[in-house]
């Protein structure tokens, strides 16, 4: 059996903290306003794999009202979500992530993001795609107020 999941996340800039995207610290003058580390890429991906396995979403599994997830490392959240997906008998077919940001530039960091995600999902790096685009200076991402991200995950029954 093959299952597809889709995830979306957005965070505004505004915190004096590192900017973490795809599990990688991206040099920038500000970080995200968020309960956890605010990693939009991993949050969207976590939602995608949870959705594909019919396990709800990131907010159900890791509620932002629970202080144990305050400033949580999103790689840990992704790994726990994937553990639950594996318990249901699924492995990764492939994942595809689109980061929507006017700034900062993502290209220099994409290979590192792919490697970390592949490690967390226990799959080959060729099963992980990360790309970035802008909104041509339109909307909140175009005004550099934050970043959005979409992700799709294909799960295969083991």
Swiss-Prot record:
The answer to whether UniProt assigns keyword Metal-binding to this entry is yes
Pathway listed for it? Isoprenoid biosynthesis; isopentenyl diphosphate biosynthesis via DXP pathway; isopentenyl diphosphate from 1-deoxy-D-xylulose 5-phosphate: step 4/6
Which reaction is recorded as catalysed by this protein?
4-CDP-2-C-methyl-D-erythritol 2-phosphate = 2-C-methyl-D-erythritol 2,4-cyclic diphosphate + CMP
Binding-site residues, 4-CDP-2-C-methyl-D-erythritol 2-phosphate: 9-11, 35-36, 57-59, 62-66, 133-136, 140-143
User: Which cofactor(s) does the record list?
Assistant: a divalent metal cation
Q: What does this protein do?
A: Involved in the biosynthesis of isopentenyl diphosphate (IPP) and dimethylallyl diphosphate (DMAPP), two major building blocks of isoprenoid compounds. Catalyzes the conversion of 4-diphosphocytidyl-2-C-methyl-D-erythritol 2-phosphate (CDP-ME2P) to 2-C-methyl-D-erythritol 2,4-cyclodiphosphate (ME-CPP) with a corresponding release of cytidine 5-monophosphate (CMP).
* Protein name stated in the entry: 2-C-methyl-D-erythritol 2,4-cyclodiphosphate synthase
**Designated gene of the protein:** ispF
């Amino acid at each position: 059996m093959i299952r597809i999941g889709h995830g979306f996340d957005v965070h505004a800039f505004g915190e004096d903290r590192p900017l973490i995207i795809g599990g990688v610290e991206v040099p920038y003058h500000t970080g995200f306003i968020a309960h956890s580390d605010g990693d939009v890429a991993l949050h969207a991906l976590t939602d995608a794999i949870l959705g594909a396995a019919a396990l709800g979403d990131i907010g159900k599994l890791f509620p932002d009202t629970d202080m144990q997830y305050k400033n949580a490392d999103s790689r840990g959240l992704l790994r726990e979500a994937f553990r639950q997906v594996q318990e249901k008998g699924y492995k990764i077919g492939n994942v595809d992530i689109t980061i929507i940001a006017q700034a900062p530039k993502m290209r220099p960091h994409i290979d590192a993001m792919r490697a970390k995600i592949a490690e967390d999902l226990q799959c080959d790096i060729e099963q992980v795609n990360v790309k970035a685009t802008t909104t041509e200076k339109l909307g909140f991402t175009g005004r550099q107020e934050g970043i959005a991200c979409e992700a799709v995950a294909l799960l295969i029954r083991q």
